[in-house]
Amino acid sequence: MSRVVLLLVCILGLCERVSAQDWPAFRGADGRGVADHPALKLNWGADENISWRQEIPGRGWSSPIVIAGRVILTTVTRDEGEPEAAKPGLYFGGNRLKPPTVVHHWNVMCLELETGDVVWQKTLHEGVPLTPRHIKNSYASETPVTDGKHVYVLFGDVGCYCLTLDGRLVWEKKLPPCRTRFGWGTAASPVLHEDRLYLISDNDEASYLLAVDKLTGDEVWRVDRDEKSNWATPYIWKNKLRTEIITPGTRKVRSYDLDGKLLYEFGGCSSITIALPYEAHGLLFVSSGYVGDTKKPLFALKPGASGDISLADDETSNEHIVWCQKR
């Protein structure tokens, strides 16, 4: 099975004209998901406003990143057979409690931005998967991140890897496989800030937030989390008062400082948290929602909170939560 990477004319034009506007991480620079440029197209499709297309072997739901005229992406291939196809639409019953029994290969690929030609490909791990996946998930769902000199690749229940832009492995850090809700697998992407890489693993066994040195892969600190399986990528909130690591969770949304100290927390999210928070107009927006839940809230926070700032059942705001849509 292969997937197709399509490059929009608007993205190619953006990176050609403004090198500072590479797409270095999940949802772009600072995780805001915003590409503000006059070259952006309103319409695109398989044959419209596309510069090139490239068949990619295997399966991977990670987003490509763009840096220095290169496109970096991850994918996982298998020695034989095809992964079970994900059915379209909303449905239940996609859980798979046992992993495949054939050898898989966890890969990172680099393509030329202007042409889509493969520049290099590297296999970072191979073996039989130790954990299952929902048929809508993949073994390569975490988006890489780059600081412009190195690329950091995470496969959630295999390991984290640092490579140079030409594909040379600098370090690797093995990560233990963990049981996730109904065997759905992992998806939270790594986050880079200054000299540290932040990795989160919310699972049904031993959840944690981990900071590692980006140059060596050595652990800087680790905090245990009273959480079960979540899939939300952490968000680095650089507000007017301080820099925080925001981690959405089913039990609590938590904020940590850059040394792993808990700053504040609040409850009220739905039973599944996936969405990345974002900042706009000086406020932080945190959301969660699941089709099976009656509550699908959206919170707006202002900087400076401490302690437990959870809303009471009859509240939609307090000193630090500016407003909440409980729907």
Predicted regions and their residues:
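N-terminal secretory signal peptides that target proteins for export/translocation
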Residues: 1-2
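Bacterial N-terminal signal peptides
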Residues: 5-15
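Noncatalytic, solvent-exposed loop/strand surfaces
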Residues: 16-327
